[in-house]
Structures are given as C-alpha cells and as structure tokens.
Design a protein with these regions (language model features):
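Aromatic-lined substrate-binding rim segments of carbohydrate-active enzymes
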Residues: 1-5
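Hydrophobic residues within beta-strands of alpha/beta enzymes
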Residues: 9-11, 52, 88, 149, ...
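Active-site-proximal loop/turn and secondary-structure-junction residues that shape catalytic pockets
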Residues: 14-17, 56-60, 92-96, 126-130, ...
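Active-site acidic/histidine proton-transfer and metal-coordination neighborhood
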Residues: 20-121, 131, 195, 202
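Histidine-acidic metal/acid-base catalytic patches
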Residues: 34, 38-42, 48-50, 105-210
Length: 210
C-alpha cells in the first residue's frame, strides 16, 4: 500500500476482542486495557498512523454511582504511554448502542477538558452527531479538543446525499480545513466497492456544491 501512495491516518476498533475489559470494573481491567493500547500504539507507530480511536461501549460502561475520575486518571495514564506522533481519540457512542458514558460530542468535549492532555482528543463522528442532534456551534467552543473526523452515516451504511449530511459536512469543511476526513462504512460481503464508490460520489457532490 505504501508503494501505491496510500497513507493510513487512523485505526478504528482497536479494542475489538477485548470487550470484557472495562475501565470502571477494576484496576486489573484497566491495566489489561492499558497493555493492549500500548501494543496498539506500537503497531500504529510502525504503520505511520496518527490517530487511534477509543470507541467500544463495552469497555466504558459506567456502573451505578461510579466517579468519572476513574476514567480521567485512566486516560491520563494512556497519554503518558503514547508515541509522540500518536493521538488517542475518544469517539462519542450514542445510547442506542447500549452505552451510558460519553454518549454525545458535548460530553466527550467536557470530559477532555478535565483530562487536559494534548494527545487525548475527540473524534468527531457524523453519524453520532446526527443521532444525538449535537449542537455544532457548541463544538466550535472546544475546537482545540478535536482530533480526527469521521464522515459516517446512520448504521454505518453508505454516505447519503441529503440536506442533513450537507449541513454537517459543510460544517466540517468550513471549520476544520486542515484536518483529514475519513469515510467510515461498515463492510458487507456483497457490495463494498459499490458502497465506497457511491459514498465518495455523494461526498464529492456535497463538496462541489459548498
């Protein structure tokens, strides 16, 4: 892929297969998660990846009456163990995916202000913004906490050409010109190339109308 001019900017689903470990469950679980993330960090470094995404809801399900401080301290510890060129981005996972901690962009941004580490940032995700009806103007107040950006659609299907997507993609372009935008689509066994092609066509149509 290097010889063909491809660059890998981000890694998603970094904790796939480790869903049983939860940052709120125990110190043992947090240490195991940290160990996995250290290994992912090395893989990302070797691939030249800039962003790794913390997104799985099962790794962060918050039990009743537990303090956010457990998570704040955990992500500060992660910060110390990342390569200087790698940023971990926390993705908001809406409640419809059985998540109850950092479910929307506003919550993630407020949390990151408490973590206060330059290499622990927010991943803007178009699908999450749509599901949560996030306030785009609020996001701009915390612009320095934005790391990676995913253009995705509901249920991770192909990116549609519609007014809501136009509004959000135009917001991304207008306010995050220096960022690399990546398309996130869930693969299937039948028509991956077709879904990717149609998504790129629809995104280009939106960009050209901007």
């Amino acid at each position: 892929w290097k010889n063909k001019g491809f660059k890998i900017y981000g890694m998603q689903s970094i904790l796939y297969g480790y869903e049983d470990f939860n940052i709120f469950k125990s110190e043992l679980d947090r240490n195991k998660l940290l160990g996995v993330i250290k290994k992912i960090n090395m893989v990302a470094k070797n691939l030249g990846v800039s962003f790794i995404t913390f997104g799985c809801p099962k790794n962060r399900f918050q039990f009743k009456n537990q303090s956010d401080n457990l998570a704040i301290d955990f992500f500060r510890l992660i910060s110390k163990n990342l390569d200087k060129n790698i940023t971990l981005c926390i993705e908001p996972i809406p409640k419809i995916y059985n998540n109850n901690f950092l479910t929307n962009t506003k919550d993630v941004l407020k949390f990151l202000k408490k973590v206060n580490k330059k290499n622990i940032l927010c991943q803007l995700d178009m699908s999450a913004i749509k599901i949560n009806n996030d306030n785009l103007n609020y996001i701009l107040k915390f612009k320095k906490y934005i790391g990676h950006i995913h253009i995705s659609d509901i249920n991770l299907g192909k990116i549609q050409y519609n007014e809501e997507n136009k509004r959000i993609i135009n917001f991304f372009i207008e306010n995050f010109k220096k960022k690399v935008f990546t398309i996130k689509i869930l693969g299937n066994k039948e028509s991956n190339l077709e879904r990717i092609s149609k998504s790129i066509t629809n995104i280009n149509r939106i960009i050209n109308e901007f």
